[in-house]
Amino acid sequence: MQKCPNRKRMGDQSPRRSTGSATVMSAVLRALSICAPAALLDIPPTLAQALEPTALAADIPAQPLPQALEALGRQTGLQFVYVSGVVQDQRSHAVSAGLGANKALTRMLEGTGLKFEYLTPHNIRILAAVVVPLQEPTKKAPSDEELQEVIVTANRREQNLQNVPMTIQVLTGETLAKLNATTFDDFVKYLPAVTAHGVGPSQSNIYVRGLATGASGVQSSGVTGGFPNVAVYLDEQSAQLPNRNLDIYAADLDRIEILEGPQGTLFGAGAEAGVVRYITNKPKLDVTEAMVNAGYATTAHGDQSSNLDATLNLPLIADQLAVRAVIYNERRGGYINNLPATFARAPTDLGIATYFNHNVPANSVSINNFNIAANHFNPVTYTGLRAEALYRLDQDWSALLVQSYQNMEADGVFAEMAANSLGEPQPDLSAQLFNPSYDKDKFENTALTINGRVGALKLVYAGAYLVRNVEQVQDYTNYARGGYAVYYQCAGPTLARVQCFTPSATWHDRERNTHQSHELRVSTPADWRVRGIGGLFYENYQIQEQVDWFYLTALPDFNPIGPPTGYYAVNGSPFQQNGTLAMFSTPGAVFVPAPATSNNPNIRPLGDAFFDDITRGYKQKAAYASVDFEVVPQTLTLTAGTRYSSTNTSEVGSAVGSETCELTYNPAPPNPCLNRSAINLNAEELDRTFSGFKSRANLSWKVNEDFLLYYTWSQGFRAGGFNRTPFPAGSNSPLAPNGEPGQAQADKHGGYVTPLAFAPDSLTNNELGWKTMWMDRRLQWNGAIYQEDWNRTQIGAYGFVIAEGVTLNGGNYRVHGVETSGVARVTSGLTIETGAAWNHSELVKQGTYLWADGTPINFGALKLPNPSGPLGSPLAGAPPFQGNVRARYELAIYGCESFAQVNAVHQAHSLATTYRLEPDLQGGSTAYDLPGFTTFDAALGAGKDAWLVQVYGENLTDTRAQLYANYTQWYKGVTVSRPRTIGLRLSYKFSGR
């Protein structure tokens, strides 16, 4: 034993010491460290408090002890000294944010047989214990067979997933790589209780727990559709749009979190049913990293695909400044064939049948698509980059700046035609389009996040600015099968001498979205018995959309349409149809010069029969707070939170048409097409503010370290909005009667009037859940039972008669469900993961729809399209069962870390929409039943050192899963899963200091 000649003298000295002298303190500690056996060195509580550095700002997961000590040092500024052989084979326990350094280090070392001692206030030695003091039995150190802990930020602070009392599904970056998932369509199938309805990449609505009613067409949805009830976040920035999900390419992501149930307290409007959060990897201050992934794949019945992404992490100033960047490109080959076809008018066309007694006028023009017919005509390409810079001012303050860019370009369509517009069956994976179609979707996002501390409180500022531009062109030739096409495409001096010109038609949508958000939040340390988080939030959305429908035959002397220059008013009030036609005015109407707000003030080209030019504004101001109180410390916790928000929505612009052109056309003055209908939305003064509280309460019981029970009551909401045209009384509404006796009732009551505005809907959730670990943390089983009540549901309806999309407030729905998920480390190499959800939804209260005279509509007695369906009807996108299972076996073969995995996914049948009795061109209901399906994926691979190679197969049975069906392009289009795909993926990773 080493002797210490000064020890007795030190013990004889007066206990008085200088409280402010780090030098004296360091000398004392050095003496103790040299002379005292490590096992006898216990720092007094007062000294430990004096030496306690900054509390942890983030959780540190269980991992090899050297890496855990390194992570602790980065957060606290402590330096650790140890002999590598002492710690190299040890694993740490996980520690939570908010703990002080001493408590965190003590927790890390539990069960390892190691102790620590202070050399100086900021230098600590780790060494083997010589004497084990009397204490509770040490816990078993984590082993390689234990399941890895997952850290999430669902409560706006870093926590172990198993300690968060809510249903959360997490796909880590490692999991995404194992699943070879890079886009939303790749990973959504592995999320029980999550579905999506859409017509192609970046053209979907996301639904959680079956809270869906269906969607209208993507054209004009930006300004006429309700906002999604599931929020999409890129780090701290929300980025959802109606019918157009932000399909962020999953390169260099830390994880994707799916928070289920209302998240209105911490995430606000739009998070009514849940949140999908893309969390990016952040720059590392102490390591240089480089990663490259390359892949090639071939799709059955389709073209080849390829992808390449590269990531670089580079410290610029040691422990202070680092940058991280990722760049990616992926081209996915098409698999839909545009078949050669000829389009000729038919006696069954609604317009031909109505006006010409099923006789096609002589000399009517036919067209073909021979010049654009092609196989595999729907490729999609993702190109993008993300650059991040992290600057740490000191141990308390840091700033993160992120710049993201992505460009997605898709050709063709992603929905096969089950039958063409005449109802004739079509081959698998085929369509018949007569004009080029494409979708271009680009976004840029700049975000700044500042983290800091003031005393014990943690402060976070998060600000971001998103710009998203969409340009889409789609073939619309099948519109000629409808009832109104003859008004625009057929003309003659008399009905007997009418000629129908080309049926070729397209629509062109240009949408620009800007979103600015700012949030300031403050939180207490996570280990306080009473802890809280609160904040202020502001966001400003603006959606500018122009949609032009080109289906008008431009005959001599036709006058092109343009934005309205004013509106008609009666006694100073804007007339309902406030256009530029005298026919839409009433006696005493006066024209008021007042140009509508225009994104494009120009006269439209000839052939443009109808256009929208609308700007939609959406502003939210909110304040929120949530408090946790440990009724029984570390055992029973009560949480209560609320959010007050004021949401303003507005709309300006115009909807302009040329429907006053007549079948009988005389080029001599007066030309009927000099007139137009023009709705000046500025005159409607479309501006509403919705405000109120939405709250959340939770009681969680930590039965033991591995068993959490909780009950949650929570509320969510979604703001209201406007329909682009308040329909006048008559048959032009999407709810228009389609036959007797509905037509007679419509005539009796003055027709149906589409509401000018739709109100917010709301969701209330009651949930009982559990999170458990078993078998020495080799088995995880989580689950929840819930009831959700969705009231005044916003329903998107598509008017087949005149192709008009509107949003209505429908009835009340109730959803009962059960979810469960499990992970089992069966052996050291075999891991099985599974998830399942059972859902039952029904309409419990019918919505109220009124005739123009205010009389309620009785859908049960009339042949009318009911947006909600009859009582007891299920929601759309709500399969009664969803489930998946994934098995992965890892083993070492010839020095390589090899693996094999297989995945299976099953989804039961569901409906595409709640809409009922609206006819389609093939007859029957548009509430299409989507059959259930099962798909299988598999992968084999091996890695050595920095290299990894894998071969994978997706949809191995080449199942044609029907994901969504719609009729918005005037034929039944069915979005199907990508056919069987076999691919090769090669990865390389470098890491150094």
For each feature predicted by the language model, list its residue ranges:
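Membrane-embedded beta-barrel scaffold of Gram-negative outer-membrane proteins
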Residues: 149-150, 309, 447-477, 708-714, ...
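Short acidic/polar hinge/loop motifs at secondary-structure boundaries
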Residues: 220-225, 229-260, 310, 353
